[in-house]
């Protein structure tokens, strides 16, 4: 038996390989066993739905002429000139005849389906006059889609017959030698369906209706074969019949089609060529919450969707998709044995007709940053508003002050968060010969409690076109990355996306970053490689997590101690800290003028009065003798230029700002100009020159890449394709402000021999002296295990004076010099 649409050689051909006119979709008709076949195991339906006729039976229905060769493929009813579907088929046929030259026939042959734009159907005047398409497609989707499929089937059949006749005429063949065209079943997949249905409106009243919904894929099942037609052989006479299985529900024939036979028992013949199986997959889609749909205290709704044939593998967890399909019901799976009355309980699901993956579509190499805003639709009103915003004189100041207007001051911190919103451009995303370089900056805000870190974080996640906000103390590792769950019905393992995967091509805000415990290791790969690898239960895979991580943390002890480094204040590893492009340190310094203005601002916000004129709140640095590149004064600092001017400030609403950010991320892909590159290179080389000490902070190419990313984001903020010299200078000022917090000690002095990751300035020499003494003792005693009392004795002998000896040992433990092996027992790691 020939497989697929082939009965000889080539696509959709039959009748032997020696046919000189063999072409696509041509072949001999089905003549029984052993002849060129026209059914398919992998296609939706087959042209013959009964067993080969026996000689003693008369098939009178085949003698009637049917103008539509594929009628039996689409309709179970016999053809009639009075059929109510004929008018619809003719209207669709007229529409497809106009479009036939636009369709790729090879693509239709490969997929077995054709994509039809719903808006083009509505714009066709002849079709609109013949069929009330919008109401009929919604209320009778199966019949309308079958009419559409039969129409394209007929148009393609006639087109190929015309093509075959032309070839026959050129070669001078006789009419009886011409091959017969057989086109298989073709699915009509309607996309761009304009009326989106929210998941909360997906109720029993929509059963059998055609709907479109948009959401995020949170779970993808395995691909399985689904039997749509099964061949059954009669146990009494041996006759074979093909029995349809609607919706994949197994049913057995009730009687034999042979009139003389009264058999009632049948055997399924799974290996028969009449048995048709298709690829089948289930996905779980979670709703997207817009501003007017946010409901406090409710978990996001989900719905199951079934994909068949060419729709399988069209999405992965984390993708944002639009599914159009028919609402159907299935029996409830859980609790079926506990309660007999559960037979009346059903679950709604979507039988997908088309899937539009708005995130999985990759652009050209110049758009390697991905379609960050691809899921956003822009109306003409939106585009005019974006044009109006872009024409503002001081756009950077407008966006920075619109980000979180309730928080007073901190303009440079808001500037860094604004740049993270827009992001840089990812390089080599589609080049399989090179490793991609991330374009999303990561930002950490550390500071005393009560300075508005969490509010700024929530504002960023709210403005982002795709933002996920999580709290560190209630987050697990699998909740951040990927959860491996078992399906209750099939027992198969499936992937459920966590916060980082759901925030792909967006923002992931993590509050209480210092209270995450052991979950920090889960972020290392996601922050640099921008993917999450999983190896569990025999499943090895990698999921994309191209997200900017914005984190807020409180220092240990409740107050930031400038005598310690960032690593010591947060008790966090250097591997994680080095991945942040900007680290902002907010210190609550008492100051009479600032406190007075801040209190006035809070009272004005609470009372609804006109906002006071803001002044820039900057860190008060004492005079110091160190001269460095971080302290070179500019004509007018960026912080001064970003502060609000005038008595009244009109901030952009978040909904409009979200549209602007989405437009910039989708359509603007800037590159560095030579002047900007020179400024960044000079600043980087100066930093390297000032950090040549043995114990100095490692200024690596990560800092240079951070500068490039932020400069691209600065140009993207103003919708420019080139980053200018001024962009680079402003980014350098933001980077200086960030580095000031890292390098300044408890006296306000700049000390370039301290880093984010090492010890505090006062403890460094003591730590080196103490560790070298431990090395000597361990070499003499051949034992690298020390009890706490022994460590205290060694420190006393060396006359090392520290305020808190336990904190001193804890610092050595954090830096990897000592490893805690048990209660008050430490192992030396440097020998």
Swiss-Prot record:
Transmembrane segments: none annotated. InterPro entries: AAA+_ATPase, MCM, MCM8/REC_WHD, MCM_dom, MCM_lid, MCM_OB, NA-bd_OB-fold, P-loop_NTPase. SMART domains: AAA, MCM. Residues 1-20 have a biased composition (Gly residues). Keywords: ATP-binding, Cell cycle, DNA damage, DNA repair, DNA replication, DNA-binding, Helicase, Hydrolase, Nucleotide-binding, Nucleus. It catalyses: ATP + H2O = ADP + phosphate + H(+). It is an enzyme of class 3 (hydrolase). Residues 1-53 are annotated as: Disordered. Component of the MCM8-MCM9 complex, which forms a hexamer composed of mcm8 and mcm9. Component of the MCM8-MCM9 complex, a complex involved in homologous recombination repair following DNA interstrand cross-links and plays a key role during gametogenesis. The MCM8-MCM9 complex probably acts as a hexameric helicase required to process aberrant forks into homologous recombination substrates and to orchestrate homologous recombination with resection, fork stabilization and fork restart. In eggs, required for elongation during DNA replication by facilitating the recruitment of rpa2/rpa34 and stimulating the processivity of DNA polymerases at replication foci. PANTHER family: DNA HELICASE MCM8, DNA REPLICATION LICENSING FACTOR MCM FAMILY MEMBER. This is DNA helicase MCM8. The gene is mcm8.
